Amino acid sequence: MNLNKHLEFFNPLKIEEDIHIIGVGAIGSNLALMLTRLGCTNIHLYDFDKVESINVANQNYFERQVGFTKLEATIENMSEINPNIEIEAHPEGWKKEHIMSGFVFLCLDNIDTRREVVLKCKNNKYITAILDFRMGLSDAQHYMADNQDEKAINRLLDTMDFTHEEAKAALPVSACGTSLSVLPTIWTVISAGVANFINFCKTNKYKHTILVNPFESIVDAF
C-alpha cells in the first residue's frame, strides 16, 4: 500500500501496538476503513451482528453485503484497500475473557458494555489508551484516556454515569422507532477521534474530550 500521501506526517509503521475496534456499526465500520487507509495494521475487530439493508445508509457496507456478518463485510472492505493488512476477527463480540493490549476503540451502542470494557482495561499496563465514540443525530462526542493515567481513566468512567436504557431514551427516532443517524455526524466525530489518536502517537498529547456538531460548525475540545 502506497502511503506517500501522508507518510512524512504520520508513519503507521511506528505503531507497534495492536488496535482493537469493539463494534463495527456506524462508527466502527467507518473508523476501521479510515485507519486502514492510514496504513494501520494488527487490527482486532469485535462484533456479532449481521449487515441489514438499513445499515447501508450510514455504515460502511454495500447492498451486496446485506446478510454478511459485519466482520466479514468489514474485513472484505479493509482488504480491498490494503491486501496485506493483518486482521483478527472476534465474531462473538467483546467478552470479559478477551486479553487485549495496545489501543482500544469503543464503538459500541451499549454504554453498560463500554463501562465494562474500561473497567476491565483499567490498571492493565499493556493497554496504551482508550478512545470512545458516541453520537446522536446532529451531535457527537469523542473521549480519550491514557490508560496509564488513573485520573484520566476515572474521568472517562465519570462520563458513563448513566444506563443503556437512559441513553436509548435520549436518542431521536423515526416515526417507526428507528434510531436516527447521518454520515456528516459520524464522519466528523471519527475524523476528530482519529486526529486525536495520531497526535497521541506522535507527541503523547491528546484531548480528553471533543464535542462536535457539523450542522452548526461547532467543534469544542479540551
Name each model-derived stretch.
Residues M1-F222:
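Adenine nucleotide-associated cytosolic modules
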